[in-house]
Amino acid sequence: MIKIDEIPFKLDSLLQRDSIFVGELPLCKLLLMNDSNFPWFLLIPRKEGVFEMFDLDEDDRLQLQKESDYLLSNLKQHFKATKMNVANLGNIVPQLHIHH
């Protein structure tokens, strides 16, 4: 079995430039966008060549959902939000990254 740390992974240069490293989850790198107006987090699966959700295998898609739910739950509680927004955009950065 290959450990996630052994899989080659390169973060898109725009994400690298515009974000602050927060931590590593089992599948994803967790970043905070460098934007003082909003608490804006990103989950990026540490897998090379992943541009769409369907590029992940079933186990990784499930893990991504678990990590997203975990992040959303904590953000909702911390900020006392009534509704959370999640987006998967790719119009500027093609690498799969989920906005929270």
Listing of model-derived features with the role each one plays in the protein:
Residues 1-100:
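HIT superfamily nucleotide-processing domains
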